[in-house]
A protein has these predicted regions:
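Outer-membrane beta-barrel architecture
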Residues: 44, 60, 97-99, 147, ...
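Bacterial Sec-dependent N-terminal signal peptides
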Residues: 1-23
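Transmembrane beta-strands of outer-membrane beta-barrel proteins
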Residues: 41-43, 78-82, 108-111, 158-160, ...
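Gram-negative/organellar outer-membrane beta-barrel architecture
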Residues: 33-41, 48-191, 275, 287-288, ...
Length: 377
């Protein structure tokens, strides 16, 4: 009896100690203020459910740090972002990405590797696809993306981008648009590698919560198919311009414009730029609209209520096109969101946004809810 009492007491103390440890860990991640340049780590649990996946569970993390803690050097925040989830129907999503700034910001490196075994809805190609044509497609995708840029003069970086990819697709209904659509090239998927130059102009005051300054990032990928897709050659051009204006101590106005184009004679559908994400054109399903060219712009007003809490409102427009863009076919989006700053020294936040898009005749208005780490741009 004494042994049982001692064992029960030991287990109770252990559980209490564990609970206190978890509470301290959560408090440190989300609520403690740290004015030093120490590293920090935060975790976001993932629990969702959908008919095509069943229950999905997982988590995302953000480890942030400085490669140089000497204040006078103004070295920017670096981070590592892991993401993993699995579903009860056997699908999975794994990725790790990093954004690294060397001491004094002389070099900037990024790297990302991901594997996705996950279904998505394919609506066809073009700027006027219909929800009724949605085709459920299973995708297996591997991607590796790398970049390296060196500071060559004040605020100007020059470097390269490189990477590899492989896509595989499986479509159950043989009569769906994914199989029957005449515009769809390489519907079985394919692999490839790429390399190309990049140029970045960046004078932002902060890379995690910018209050003033601008960044212009341009790159071109020279792409070559491999294995069964060995005959493919092409290119991909992208440019993004973002600028921030400090209206007062708590109010920031941000502008963001992106353009992407697939070049070359072929148009593998999985390489086509697509409209809609948690960062640009919030409110649209990613891939609802896709084509050889994509353009979009947005403006976001950010109000910092306190050190911890912020709110935003955003409005934008964008479209995809096979050739030239047209102002008359731009699709609108607007919405708002909440920010919680878990690391006030580094300006790191958790964001929750609700975006609203176009109302297509005969369909419900398009919309989306997003939770993520960091700012949208």
């Amino acid at each position: 009896m004494k042994k049982l009492f001692v064992l029960s007491l030991t287990l109770f103390c252990f559980q209490q100690s564990q609970a206190q440890g978890i509470q301290k860990f959560i408090k440190k991640m989300y609520f403690d203020k740290d004015s030093t340049k120490h590293s920090s780590f935060v975790v976001l649990p993932i629990v969702t459910s959908a008919p095509e996946t069943g229950l999905e569970v997982g988590g995302a993390g953000l480890y942030s740090f400085y490669s140089d803690t000497i204040t006078a050097n103004h070295t920017r925040v670096s981070n590592i972002y892991p993401y993993v989830s699995v579903t009860t129907k056997g699908q999975s999503h794994f990725s790790v990405s990093t954004d690294h700034w060397s001491p004094k910001n002389l070099y900037h490196y990024t790297a990302s590797v991901s594997y996705i075994n996950y279904p998505f809805n394919f609506y066809g190609i073009g700027n006027n696809t219909r929800k009724a044509d949605a085709d459920h497609v299973d995708e297996k995708r591997f991607k590796l993306d790398l970049s390296d840029a060196k500071l060559v003069t004040k605020n100007l970086y020059a470097g390269f981008v490189a990477g590899a990819y492989h896509y595989s697709y499986f479509d159950t209904p043989p009569t769906g648009i994914f199989i029957t659509g005449p515009q769809i090239e390489d519907r079985d998927g394919g692999g490839g590698i790429y390399i190309g130059p990049s140029l970045v102009l960046d004078n932002r005051d902060n890379n995690t919560y910018t209050t003033k300054g601008l960044i212009i990032n341009a790159y071109y990928k020279l792409m070559k198919g491999v294995f069964s897709n060995n005959g493919y050659t092409g290119g991909f051009f992208g440019i993004e311009y973002s600028q921030f204006f400090k209206l007062n101590s708590n109010l920031i106005l941000g502008l963001d414009i992106q353009e992407q184009s697939l070049t070359g004679g072929s148009s593998p559908f999985y390489l086509l730029p697509s409209l809609g994400s948690d960062e640009m054109m919030r409110g649209y399903y990613n891939g609802r609209y896709r084509d050889r060219n994509f353009i979009a712009g947005q403006t976001e007003l950010r109000y910092r209520i306190s050190d911890r809490i912020g709110i935003v409102g955003f409005v934008g427009a964008g479209e995809v096109a096979h050739g030239k863009f047209s102002v008359s076919t731009l699709k609108p989006n607007y919405g708002g969101g909440l920010r919680y700053f878990f690391d006030t020294e580094k300006g790191l936040s958790i964001r929750a946004d609700y975006g609203i898009g176009q109302k297509v005749a005969g369909e419900q208005r398009q919309s989306g809810f997003y939770i993520g780490l960091g700012q949208a741009f």
